[in-house]
């Protein structure tokens, strides 16, 4: 998620990354971050859609999130692991030049991939997938409404409001931008997908994260994921 942003600054990079995660605008129509992911998206950079126009830095902690909605609505959230019985089947492609994160996958994640480029080995770009099962009076529209809040609350976040989209035929919301971690600016894009299944609602979140000069590999990878991912509820 390198060079494109040099042509027009971070603003262009943010938009480009978001569009890549959105499938370059294809399959876009009128997702989430769970309460677990809202505390973990900025932690996933080492293992580890979009904005229409850049905005000024967001004020940390000022935007309502999916985690807030879950808590306020008395909804029960259960983290989902890959292959767990009774959960949606997610087939995420692994692009060339990337590999499964394996033991480096965060404990809270459904799965993760990282770049294998040796020039980025010190801090490789990553894409982390999280999934949660929501039980209770869940309004899918509210999940999408509050999806942008998590990224907007990251330290020094700069980006747009994001936009609606789809992934694997399911409604989603994507947002992208930059934020500051350990004094360095990083690029991040997030796609939140709502998957109704067997009377429950599952929420899938994809977090693509990397340094500013890793924009290119991230764009290529997220584009393939958007085009080739299949979801079976």
Q: Where do the language-model regions lie?
A:
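N-terminal low-complexity, Pro/Thr/Ser-rich intrinsically disordered segments
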Residues: 44-84
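Short, well-structured beta-strand
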Residues: 171-233
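N-terminal export and membrane-targeting signals
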Residues: 1-14
């Amino acid at each position: 998620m390198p060079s494109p942003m040099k042509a027009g600054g971070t603003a262009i990079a943010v938009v480009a990354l978001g569009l890549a995660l959105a499938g370059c605008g294809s399959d876009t129509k009128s997702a989430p971050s769970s309460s677990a992911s809202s505390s973990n998206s900025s932690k996933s950079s080492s293992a580890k859609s979009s904005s229409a126009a850049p905005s000024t830095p967001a004020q940390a902690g000022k935007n309502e999130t999916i985690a807030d909605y879950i808590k306020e609505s008395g909804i029960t959230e259960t983290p989902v692991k890959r292959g767990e019985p009774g959960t949606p089947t997610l087939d995420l492609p692994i692009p060339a030049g990337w590999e499964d994160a394996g033991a480096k996958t965060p404990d809270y994640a459904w799965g993760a991939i990282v770049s294998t480029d040796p020039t980025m080995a010190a801090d490789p770009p990553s894409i982390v997938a999280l999934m949660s099962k929501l039980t209770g009076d869940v309004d899918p529209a509210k999940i999408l409404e509050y999806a942008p809040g998590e990224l907007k609350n990251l330290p020094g976040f700069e980006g747009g409001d994001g936009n609606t989209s789809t992934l694997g035929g399911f409604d989603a919301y994507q947002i992208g931008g930059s934020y500051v971690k350990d004094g360095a600016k990083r690029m991040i894009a997030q796609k939140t997908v709502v998957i109704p299944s067997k009377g429950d609602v599952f929420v899938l979140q994809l977090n693509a994260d990397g340094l500013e000069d890793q924009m290119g590999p991230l764009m290529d990878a997220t584009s393939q994921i958007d085009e080739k991912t299949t979801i079976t509820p």
